[in-house]
């Protein structure tokens, strides 16, 4: 799968503590080895649709991926498929605020 990283995601990863940075790097390697059906089925990533949440730049549906037990990446899917990593939230409950 092709991965696109937005600046906000990259900045959040760089500002995060070392365990989150390592987990994000591990997640990126894993994502590159998956195709879309595998992404939906992967139990560790817990890829799920965020109902009612749309990426403002593209108008695409937003999804959540588990980075660590408490950290979530917010992403959208483009044609291809390309997974766009939009943001990273170290406290996962903040990822779901509108």
Located regions from the model:
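Arg/Lys-rich, positively charged N-terminal/basic patches that mediate binding to nucleic acids
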Residues: 1-35
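A general secondary-structure junction signal
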Residues: 7, 43-45, 69
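Enriched for short, Lys/Arg-rich terminal
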Residues: 11, 22, 60-98
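Amphipathic alpha-helical interaction segments
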Residues: 17-18, 48, 97
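Residue-level signal for secondary-structure boundary elements
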Residues: 21, 36-40, 91
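Terminal low-complexity, poorly structured segments
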Residues: 24-30, 46, 81-84
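A short, surface-exposed loop/turn module that caps and links secondary-structure elements
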Residues: 34-65
């Amino acid at each position: 799968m092709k991965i696109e990283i937005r600046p906000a995601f990259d900045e959040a990863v760089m500002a995060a503590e070392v365990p989150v940075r390592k987990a994000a790097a591990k997640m990126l390697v894993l994502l590159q080895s998956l195709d879309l059906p595998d992404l939906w089925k992967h139990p560790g990533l817990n890829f799920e649709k965020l109902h009612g949440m749309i990426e403002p730049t593209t108008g695409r549906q937003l999804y959540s991926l588990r980075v660590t037990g408490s950290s979530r990446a917010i992403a959208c899917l483009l044609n291809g498929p390309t997974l766009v990593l939009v943001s990273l939230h170290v406290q996962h409950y903040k990822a779901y605020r509108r």
